[in-house]
């Protein structure tokens, strides 16, 4: 069984779509009213509201710095979530390797938001994609020098570069393009 992600029509919710009726709800064309958009990214997901025990088990280092996290879901930011699930301070270390133009803004972005646009899925104009990939891969190459591959083991860090790209996509497309968010769904095929 493999989970696949699909763009769906705007008037549909994820729960309406099943494996059997998927073709009826797939997004096959972008509505003309969006012709002046540069890009489309997935509707965001909210990452706050983790169970208290999970915050204690996986976010204890962050709790030592700021115990109020456990009582304030707004403090369960992208940065906090990344620390819990993909290695403490790995996102901060990676951000330090970003180009100067994006470093401080992205740091601010991940420290103050508790949602992001998931799955590294986008639809964009060719020139936008070219700029996105140039910026992303030059950063990820620098990250490879810092993190390598051999030390990245298990769920937490094995796919570290994909997790970094996923968080960066939200920031980059919102900063650099006229974007719109579109619904998506996951179907087990």
Where are these regions (language model features)?
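ER/Golgi luminal nucleotide-sugar-dependent glycosyltransferases, focusing on the catalytic module
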Residues: 1-189
